[in-house]
A protein has these predicted regions:
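Adenosine-phosphate binding glycine-rich loop
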Residues: 180-186, 191-245
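Cys/His-enriched microdomains
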Residues: 248-251, 276
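Short cysteine-rich clusters marking metal-coordination/redox-active sites
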Residues: 250-253, 266
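Cys/His-rich metal-chelating microdomains
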Residues: 256, 283-284, 288
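Short Cys/His-rich "knuckle" micro-motifs
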Residues: 260-263, 293
């Protein structure tokens, strides 16, 4: 994929709130197939679009990119055939399959900002949208649909269109659901919702932390603070849809390989292995294994 196409693709992914990693080659010591300026996009399923090197380099970029999606932190990745220690702000990976060259690739996870739906044309709703945007959240007016990655929904409409939105958000599992209302009115609204009690109990009303908020801006601030406080631990800046990266060892070269549909893998040809999946860094290792599996008797994998 040429750079112009890759740039357009990044725009499409950001518009659709799809998390990805931008991988950019910043250093190449020959012999390597990649050159500085080569780049790729790595999706959360391990798919790579673009070019950052051959099979073995690509396998390492895939694994470390998924690690950055999980952590939310950028990484300067050094891939080298030599054994080196990590240095400050640089992850060093020994790759025995490289043809003798060294690559450095900057990995930048691009994760959609938390999505918050707001209902209402009230001063509190307007202040919430304004403050949330400053914080870096994606603030949207609720229009009847809720994205699967929605982080919060806040009803600040003073009695208009409350029930349907609250029920929909609760049923669809939105992590934070808040209702701006007095304690008494909020309790009445929640009581009449046509859902079970366990879901009703998840409504935050009066929405916001008890900080003595009085003005619309202060109330909006208290709600944002509560949204932050309710955020699960360990997900600051990371993509919540990822799990810890699972890897297996390439039986031929000993490299770690991400267990992903995007990684090269084959069913072990020995029927006694009961369909064991064996994972490879590249085509060369895959061909070598399939040509003589008995030479790599210690192969492990997933069924």
């Amino acid at each position: 994929m040429i750079r112009q196409g890759l740039s357009s693709r990044r725009g499409v992914l950001r518009q659709s709130r799809t998390p990805f990693v931008h991988a950019l080659v910043v250093y190449a010591q020959p012999p390597t197939s990649a050159k500085p300026g080569d780049e790729a996009i790595v999706l959360s399923d391990g798919t790579i679009e673009g070019f950052v090197g051959g099979d073995c380099a690509e396998a390492t970029v895939r694994q470390q990119s998924l690690e950055t999606l999980h952590s939310g932190e950028t990484m300067l990745l050094r891939i080298t055939p030599d054994v080196e220690n990590d240095v400050v702000r640089k992850k060093v990976v020994h790759n025995p399959c490289l043809s003798g060259g060294t690559l450095e690739v900057f990995l930048e996870p691009l994760i959609p900002p938390p999505l918050v739906y707001v209902i209402g044309n009230t001063p509190v709703a307007e202040s919430l949208v304004s403050l949330g945007s400053v914080v870096g959240y994606a603030m949207e007016t609720y229009s009847g649909t809720i994205a699967k990655d929605a982080h919060a929904l806040v009803v600040a409409s003073h009695g208009k269109n409350e029930d349907e939105a609250l029920v929909k958000a609760l049923v669809e599992g939105v992590p934070y659901v808040g209702l701006v209302a007095s304690k008494r009115r909020g309790a009445d609204v929640v009581a009449r919702l046509a859902i079970d009690e366990a879901l009703k109990a998840k409504v935050r009303t009066p929405a916001g932390l008890p900080i003595g908020a009085y003005t619309a801006g202060e109330i909006a601030l208290s709600i944002l603070a509560e949204i932050v406080a309710e955020r699960p631990s360990g997900v600051v800046g990371c993509y919540e849809g990822t799990r810890a990266v699972t890897t297996e060892i390439d039986p031929v070269c000993g490299m770690e390989v991400v267990v992903s549909e995007a990684s090269l893998h084959s069913v072990h040809p020995d029927p006694d292995q009961n369909g064991l999946l064996v994972w490879f860094c590249g085509n060369g290792c895959q061909r070598a294994f399939l040509a003589d599996p008995t030479a790599f008797a210690g192969a492990r994998g997933h069924h």
